[in-house]
């Protein structure tokens, strides 16, 4: 049994409780405020319906004939082959360039000229402007090489030696 404290002794640790009445109760098994068990003790619950409606007609399973399986596999192979050919010929049409700006030769022009950088242009913009039918990345690399540029940053009005064509 736990001792009972006097009713008017202040408790500095718990100021939210009532000031009148006992602070300690006897150690008795406290009754739970939880509701009682709602399930039977020994047997699992049985669900009578799942809530999913199903038609009352017979649902016999028919095996898929091997001809259907082979036919679908051949159809999938034909579609895969067709997509591969489209990708291959599409790459041949664009010349294999990532940006699609390459001509049939895919070469950087040999002729050089002095060009001036315009407002808002990057190195790649200049490359597209001076050699629109050549691979942009290769033209930009050639401009960088000809002018000794370490970065692709350009200043407005800067003059560059560039391949044109």
UniProtKB/Swiss-Prot annotation:
Residues 29-44 have a biased composition (Low complexity). The keyword Cell membrane applies. It is found in: Cell membrane. Disulfide bonds: none annotated. Disruption phenotype: Mutants have stable FtsZ rings. Deletion mutant is more sensitive to DNA damage. Deletion of the gene causes a 10% increase in average cell length. Loss of the gene does not influence the growth of M.tuberculosis in mice lungs and spleen. It is a single-pass membrane protein. GO terms for cellular component: plasma membrane. Pfam families: LysM. InterPro entries: LysM_dom. Its EC number is 3.4.-.-. GO terms for biological process: cell wall organization. GO terms for molecular function: hydrolase activity. Residues 116-163 are annotated as: LysM-type. It is an enzyme of class 3 (hydrolase). Residues 1-64 are annotated as: Disordered. Keywords: Cell membrane, Cell wall biogenesis/degradation, Hydrolase, Membrane, Transmembrane, Transmembrane helix. Induction: Up-regulated in the presence of nitric oxide, reactive oxygen intermediates, mitomycin C, cephalexin or during growth in macrophages. Expression is strongly DNA damage inducible independently of RecA. Down-regulated under hypoxic growth conditions. The chain crosses the membrane at residues 70-90. Residues 1-10 have a biased composition (Pro residues). Cell wall hydrolase that modulates cell division process. Probably acts by modulating FtsZ ring assembly. Murein hydrolase activity is targeted to sites of nascent peptidoglycan (PG) synthesis. Overproduction compromises midcell localization of FtsZ rings, but has no effect on the intracellular levels of FtsZ. Interacts with the cell division proteins FtsI and FtsQ. This is Cell wall hydrolase ChiZ.
